[in-house]
Regions:
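Class I S-adenosyl-L-methionine
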Residues: 1-196
Length: 196
């Protein structure tokens, strides 16, 4: 008997990306297409903002290979475009344009304390775990990057992987690159369309 590690086992061709026009309101304002009912402040989180990768067809519940094999995966989804650099190559054709179901968490004053509580809960229950940053969205400030560095110090079982559109040479990009260089064993975040 095999164990299914994904909630969704059928993979369908995603087709062509849905590309916004330059003058589309979401492109101009830097927001998600799905703000109504899908964008929430963490202060209203009735459940965790870090959710099992089991709910994502591309990620799955547990790491299957490598040094983190066997570690459960949790994901964080922020609002695309609102947290991303306008220089992102996928500003208009972000795959979030076709993702109407995920809840996007606002980068507001309640997000960091809520993530901290979620991490504390996970650390009490699970010796080693992985956070996939970010299914949608990106690092939105240097302070936010530094907070992840502090959480790495606080929670020895925390491991992080993901991608960022923030390029080296920007304040946020340099913060991410430095953290990845110094803590690659637990902070494996790569720069999209560029070197790690």
């Amino acid at each position: 008997m095999t164990t299914v590690l994904r909630r969704f086992t059928d993979h369908k061709d995603a087709g062509e990306p849905y590309k916004l026009e330059q003058d589309h309101l979401a492109a101009r304002l830097g927001t998600s297409l799905f703000r109504d009912g899908r964008l929430r402040s963490a202060k209203f989180a009735d459940k965790a903002v870090l959710v099992s990768g089991h709910n994502n067809r591309k990620i799955g519940a547990v790491i299957q290979k490598g040094k983190w094999k066997g570690y459960p995966v949790f994901t964080l989804t922020l609002e695309e475009r609102a947290t991303c650099p306008r220089s992102c190559l996928h500003w208009l054709d972000c795959y979030g344009n076709k993702m109407n179901w995920p809840t996007r968490w606002m980068a507001d004053d309640d997000l960091i304390p809520t993530i901290g509580r979620n991490l504390s809960d996970l650390a009490r229950e699970i010796p080693n775990f992985v956070i996939r940053l970010h299914v949608l969205g990106d690092f939105y400030s240097v302070a936010y990057v530094r907070q992840w560095a502090a959480w790495l110090d606080e929670f020895s079982g925390l491991h992080i992987y993901g991608y960022t559109a923030w390029q080296p040479g920007t304040a946020i990009g340099d913060s991410i690159s430095t953290l990845a260089r110094d803590r690659w064993d637990r902070f494996a975040v790569r720069t999209s369309n560029g070197a790690a």
